[in-house]
């Protein structure tokens, strides 16, 4: 097995304040996301979405958080993609935000439900026109013989809709992740990291620190 040529010697870094476990987890998420928006050069709303088949075979990919509140976290996708098929069969998912520049991550576990048609329509209409056309042209996760086939399909739907409105495809919508666990992780010197997990029981949240 090839080893990476990286040093295991930890260097001292500017320490962040300890995670406040008395805080509301959503207020803490908002503060960390605000820090990420100021510090991260690329897509601070990027998150890893992990799904699994009913028999436990996992898969993961990067998606973009598009909205959130205390009810949960929303992303949009093709409903015929692998992730959507796995969510339909097993709605338990995990999200992971990693902000390297801040040396922080947030891990969220919860269950998915579909967003409403009104929510999906409103977000779809806000997308760039070429992205809306692409949602019609692409059979996401299906085999593609040649790139020219995708370009041909895009040309066809562009001609079909012209300068008129582009409706949302029936196979395109969003998923709402309703969290039952939110873990905050912060890098500290010598791998003695700061971890805290907030867990939902009913409508109440409780928090505890974890060993790093």
Swiss-Prot record:
Free-text function comment from the UniProt entry: Catalyzes the oxidation of either pyridoxine 5'-phosphate (PNP) or pyridoxamine 5'-phosphate (PMP) into pyridoxal 5'-phosphate (PLP).
Binding note for cofactor: Binds 1 FMN per subunit.
Cofactor(s), by name: FMN
Family annotation (SUPFAM superfamilies): FMN-binding split barrel (SSF50475)
Protein name: Pyridoxine/pyridoxamine 5'-phosphate oxidase
Record's keyword annotation contains Oxidoreductase: yes
Species of the source: Acidiphilium cryptum (strain JF-5)
Annotated metabolic or biological route of this protein: Cofactor metabolism; pyridoxal 5'-phosphate salvage; pyridoxal 5'-phosphate from pyridoxamine 5'-phosphate: step 1/1; Cofactor metabolism; pyridoxal 5'-phosphate salvage; pyridoxal 5'-phosphate from pyridoxine 5'-phosphate: step 1/1
NCBIfam families: pdxH, PRK05679.1
Keywords carried by this UniProt record: Flavoprotein, FMN, Oxidoreductase, Pyridoxine biosynthesis
A molecular-function term among this protein's GO annotations: pyridoxamine phosphate oxidase activity
Similarity comment: Belongs to the pyridoxamine 5'-phosphate oxidase family.
Record's catalysed reaction(s): pyridoxamine 5'-phosphate + O2 + H2O = pyridoxal 5'-phosphate + H2O2 + NH4(+); pyridoxine 5'-phosphate + O2 = pyridoxal 5'-phosphate + H2O2
InterPro entries recorded: Pyridox_Oxase (IPR000659), Pyridox_Oxase_CS (IPR019740), Pyridox_Oxase_N (IPR011576), Pyridoxamine_oxidase_dimer_C (IPR019576), Split_barrel_FMN-bd (IPR012349)
Quaternary structure, from the entry: Homodimer.
Pfam families hit by this protein: PNP_phzG_C (PF10590), PNPOx_N (PF01243)
GO biological process: pyridoxine biosynthetic process
EC numbers for this chain: 1.4.3.5
List of residues binding FMN: 61-66, 76-77, 82-83, 105, 140-141, 185, 195
Residues engaged in binding substrate: 66, 123, 127, 131, 191-193
Protein's UniProt keywords contain Oxidoreductase: yes
Gene3D superfamilies: Electron Transport, Fmn-binding Protein, Chain A
